[in-house]
Amino acid sequence: MTASTATETLLHKGSGLQVVVGLGQSGLSVAHYLAEQGYQVAVTDNQENPALADKLPATIDIRQFGAIDAELLQQAARIIISPGISLDNDAIAAARAANIPVVSDIQLFCEACTVPIVAITGSNAKSTVTTLVGQMAADAGINVGVGGNIGVPALSLLSNDKMELAVIELSSFQLETVTNLGAQVATVLNMSPDHLDRHGDMLGYHQAKHRIFQGAKSVVINREDALTRPLVSDSLPRLSTGIHAPNKGHYGLITDAAGQTYLARGTERLISADKLKIKGRHNLLNAQAALALGELAGLPLESMLSTLQQFAGLEHRCQYVATIAGIDYFNDSKGTNIGSTMAAVEGLGAVYAPKDGKLLLILGGQGKAQQFGELSPFINQYVSQVLFIGEDSQQIEQHLRAAGLSDEVSLHQCQTLENAFSMIEQVTASSLSQVQAVLLSPACASFDQFNGFVARGERFSQLVKQLNTVSQQALS
């Protein structure tokens, strides 16, 4: 349909038009939801032939593809923007200047949802904690919907009329247009620089993330990260998490005289860290966050601990792949920012440090204008070898060196994962090698060499398996 035809159609159909901008999975869910509610709906997308266009309801006949139609947006009663579309887009900015409401699918969801919402955001670990809380709820016998920025679009959860609890992961892109989410419990797990190309600076990023607390009935706070603390009433119910012994009623870690670490609630030891399948100090924080969120959502503690003990984590998130010649291999391809990589290096590094072991870290890709020098202290403490891949590898090395990287850390420019594995064989063959674990945690986007972090992680795992085969043949 041409722009002129679209305008004529609007004149005939009248006002109240809902315009969906962006036809990804969330945009498609919005289009279906609004059409089912009886709204007049139009869809516009930058792509000439969006892959999901043939899945739109037949009742939506206003479809403007190839560019976001500024004229169409000016006719809207409300615009529902997909997470991948920036508010700075010229057509969107013009619509906002004309006082046309611009919201996300999450705004529609929270307005329509009649069950308690557990809302989770953060720079890292969102998917892990969201999945874990969802599993805890399901294992406790609750009919739970899990979605948002993970898997199922939030609006699609509403089709389950038996749903008793919604657990949703939210990105900063989804939150920047949300008002008064009204969650039963909300949390910002952690904050580190990410998506600054979209939000402008840390202030803009922080403001977007903290919209999750609007209207919340209770909150969970990470004591180790001041940027997660919301500006809410002191009377609002809250629980906190951290790496040290907690105050009464809160979550933390207790280490006994023998050096054994336990998840704890107040002075009560809940479970030994050794009994968990997910490893690393960062995952102990994730486990605490899930327990705290679950408690404030009304889940029973014993059931949550049982689920936690069985939880093996998610693919591409500090995922154990194999042990070859005594060296453990971990796939953290989802580590696409420096905060995530800091957590992975510190979390796993602390596991191997007592045995005088070091990590070999594979780093690089598209750097997203991050300050990689912030990684240097963590690398100095836990890493003996850094292998760089991807288009920004030279710049990342320069950042690390300028930030006081230790001379004891060896750096290798490898460009590709394949070259990195050739270097791994050389490095680990040395009798002087301290490497006890190889960690892919790139701190970068993957689109310079792969079609996403999943493809990058899968390639890493393939190369590990190939290396294992070679190792087995050498032993036979």
Swiss-Prot record:
Keyword Cytoplasm: yes
Keyword Protein biosynthesis belongs to the record: no
UniProt subcellular location: Cytoplasm
Residues that hold ATP according to the record: 122-128
GO biological process: cell division; cell wall organization; peptidoglycan biosynthetic process; regulation of cell shape
Catalytic activity: UDP-N-acetyl-alpha-D-muramoyl-L-alanine + D-glutamate + ATP = UDP-N-acetyl-alpha-D-muramoyl-L-alanyl-D-glutamate + ADP + phosphate + H(+)
Keywords of the record: ATP-binding, Cell cycle, Cell division, Cell shape, Cell wall biogenesis/degradation, Cytoplasm, Ligase, Nucleotide-binding, Peptidoglycan synthesis
Gene Ontology cellular component terms for the protein in this record: cytoplasm
A single GO molecular function term of this UniProt record: ATP binding
SUPFAM superfamilies assigned to the protein according to its UniProt record, in alphabetical order: MurCD N-terminal domain, MurD-like peptide ligases, catalytic domain, MurD-like peptide ligases, peptide-binding domain
Pfam families: Mur_ligase_C (PF02875), Mur_ligase_M (PF08245), MurD-like_N (PF21799)
EC class name: ligase
EC numbers, comma separated: 6.3.2.9
Pathway: Cell wall biogenesis; peptidoglycan biosynthesis
Primary location recorded for the protein, binned into one broad class: cytoplasm
Family assignment from sequence similarity: Belongs to the MurCDEF family.
Summary of the function given for this chain in its UniProt record: Cell wall formation. Catalyzes the addition of glutamate to the nucleotide precursor UDP-N-acetylmuramoyl-L-alanine (UMA).
Stated name of the protein: UDP-N-acetylmuramoylalanine--D-glutamate ligase
Species of the source: Psychrobacter arcticus (strain DSM 17307 / VKM B-2377 / 273-4)
Taxonomic lineage of the native organism: Bacteria, Pseudomonadati, Pseudomonadota, Gammaproteobacteria, Moraxellales
